[in-house]
A protein has these predicted regions:
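Sensory beta-strand/linker motifs that couple input domains to effectors
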Residues: 18, 71
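Active-site-proximal alpha-helical element of nucleotidyl cyclase-like catalytic domains
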Residues: 89-108
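Short loop/turn elements at sensory-signaling interfaces that couple input to output
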Residues: 2-15, 27, 170
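Conserved nucleotide-binding and Mg2+-coordinating catalytic segments in signaling enzymes
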Residues: 33-53, 64, 73-87, 95
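Hydrophobic scaffolding residues in well-structured cytosolic catalytic/regulatory domains
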Residues: 32, 50-57, 101, 119
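A short pre-motif secondary-structure segment
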Residues: 109-113, 153
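Hydrophobic framework residues that shape the active-site pocket
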Residues: 65, 78, 96-97, 111, ...
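Catalytic-core segments of nucleotide cyclases and related cyclic-nucleotide turnover enzymes
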Residues: 87, 132, 136, 149-151, ...
Length: 192
């Protein structure tokens, strides 16, 4: 709603009110924001959203004296799926894994695809009491076969875990530490 004072031809002052419907503009803005923070393939949140949300969770943990955790997952030998079956089946697998992760209680809105075959899960302070259960639920997802191209395929993952604010309160440092822990798990035999 806009109001502007105008002068009529006879010199008298009047107010002119203009009303604009901005519904379409707001819907467009919301769609742009969603595209900026969402991975186009899996529908999970992306790296940019992860960094923003992780900063908020770290602040919350520090304010409340709570703890949270960052889990960095990398699919083991995913290249074999892509090369052996084709990228379209790799995409199907990534979507299936994303869907399964989002169904785990306590992390429904804190799963992120960092790119390629790497995922981050943030366990916020309010879900930290379920930390052990969440890790076990993730492991269960990867203990079962995935049905691709008329056959069952196993896909394991390696996981690096750091807690916050114990391991630090810098988003960049926490992601880097979890990534390093994940590569250590890969070096010691994968599927860990």
């Amino acid at each position: 709603l806009l109001c502007k004072e105008i002068a009529w031809v006879d010199g008298k002052k009047a107010n002119l009110y203009s009303l604009y419907d901005i519904t379409d503009k707001k819907l467009y803005q919301r769609r742009i924001e969603q595209q900026a923070y969402t991975d186009f393939l899996t529908g999970l949140y992306n790296r940019m959203c992860c960094e923003r949300d992780l900063a908020r969770q770290i602040d919350q943990a520090k304010k409340t004296g709570g703890k949270g955790a960052l889990l960095y997952l990398d699919l083991d030998d995913f290249k074999h799926i892509n090369d052996g079956l084709g990228h379209q089946y790799g995409d199907v697998l990534l979507k299936s894994i994303s869907h399964a992760l989002k169904r785990i209680n306590g992390i429904e809105n804190t799963c992120y695809r960092m790119g390629g075959d790497e995922f981050v899960i943030v366990i916020p302070p309010e879900s930290y009491s379920r930390f052990g259960n969440i890790v076990e639920d993730i492991k269960k997802i990867f203990s079962k076969p995935w049905f691709l191209k008329d056959a069952d395929y196993y896909c394991t993952m390696s996981m690096g875990i750091v807690t916050f604010p114990d391991a630090g309160d810098s988003v960049t440092d926490l992601i880097k530490k979890a990534d390093i822990a994940m590569y250590e798990a890969k070096k010691t035999g994968k599927n860990r």
